[in-house]
Amino acid sequence: MRRKLTFQEKLLIFIKKTKKKNPRYVAIVLPLIAVILIAATWVQRTEAVAPVKHRENEKLTMTMVGDIMMGRHVKEIVNRYGTDYVFRHVSPYLKNSDYVSGNFEHPVLLEDKKNYQKADKNIHLSAKEETVKAVKEAGFTVLNLANNHMTDYGAKGTKDTIKAFKEADLDYVGAGENFKDVKNIVYQNVNGVRVATLGFTDAFVAGAIATKEQPGSLSMNPDVLLKQISKAKDPKKGNADLVVVNTHWGEEYDNKPSPRQEALAKAMVDAGADIIVGHHPHVLQSFDVYKQGIIFYSLGNFVFDQGWTRTKDSALVQYHLRDNGTAILDVVPLNIQEGSPKPVTSALDKNRVYRQLTKDTSKGALWSKKDDKLEIKLNHKHVIEKMKKREKQEHQDKQEKENQVSVETTT
């Protein structure tokens, strides 16, 4: 795939061509062009981003995005400008969140590529160890590793990825060194709310799924999928107040969720999922609401180098939970430019993203266009009620334990 040239690169090519024909002309205009190049770069680096507004009585703010791929042409941009450059337009959203998740669409390689056994497939993605530290510094708190590229460089690549995440102290879901490890659920206390995060993939090649002895990803086998979600919500097991499920599913470049996606989504909500975040198609798919569970079938790419218009359309979701249990989700339309996600300003582009996000949405869903985003309203009182009930039980358990210690001490 040929990368689109930047304004600066086009100018440099123009200079080279003109220099051969008219060196004297170049000597005159070269200083002026140098000023233009510097100014253009400065504008790109310092372009203002709208501040993120917090609502009153917010309990927590969570941000969720789609596929993150920091290799190939994105790596060239990072090498030139730094990682901050890639996230510069969305940094306020990431930094002003209590929880940030996305799909990490490649393994981390700690050695030269020749030391790895490539998977039998056409496209192989990879990233360097510093990428994990970079996404953590950008604001991500947990990432999904269950996807069709995690085993691109074999078992060794998957193990290196897990090692890199552990060394960076960044939580991950959906991949592990064996079947027991891959079923790990991440529990995080987010402003008093116990949030469980899970990750599964329905897109994989032979040998990519974790077994008793082999590292890999966690598949969307319905038996395992639904048991894991129920476990996360069960008061006697995970006891989570809010359950977020990452799903790598659907068909690539298909902007409509498949019947399988729709059936699995409803089954997941019935099992206890509150938020389902889909990725893999590389294009946007509509969201839907089922029994107050929110389903984003595909948020498309987030950081990627694909050049097709539909693969450059993206969205960022911010989940705001209020103290009274009202959940408001802001869906911010984005467009990917030079690998970097940027909030859309053109009315035409906004409407294209809005249309794609809502064309298959059920009629009963409560949503509206507000300011520069879609706003979705949900009744998530059950999350607050579960949190209060859990806190009360934890307090009672603590008191009983302290009383028991006191009795043992006095006797």
Swiss-Prot record:
**What membrane topology was assigned to this protein in its record?**
Single-pass membrane protein
Q: Which PANTHER family match?
A: PGA BIOSYNTHESIS PROTEIN CAPA, POLYGLUTAMINE SYNTHESIS ACCESSORY PROTEIN RV0574C-RELATED
Which SUPFAM superfamilies does the entry link to?
A: Metallo-dependent phosphatases
- CDD domains, per the entry: MPP_CapA
- Region spans: Disordered: 386-411
Quote the biased-composition stretches of kind Basic and acidic residues, using this chain's numbering. 386-403
| Transmembrane residue ranges | 25-44
**Places the protein is found:** Cell membrane
According to UniProt, the name of this protein is Capsule biosynthesis protein CapA
What does the sequence similarity comment in the record state about its family? Belongs to the CapA family.
| Pathway membership, UniProt | Capsule biogenesis; capsule polysaccharide biosynthesis
Q: What is the lineage of its organism?
A: Bacteria, Bacillati, Bacillota, Bacilli, Bacillales
Keyword annotations for this protein, in alphabetical order, are:
Capsule biogenesis/degradation, Cell membrane, Membrane, Plasmid, Transmembrane, Transmembrane helix, Virulence
Q: Which organism is it from?
A: Bacillus anthracis
Query: Can you supply a Gene Ontology BP term from the record?
Result: capsule polysaccharide biosynthetic process
User: Does Transmembrane count among this protein's keywords?
Assistant: yes
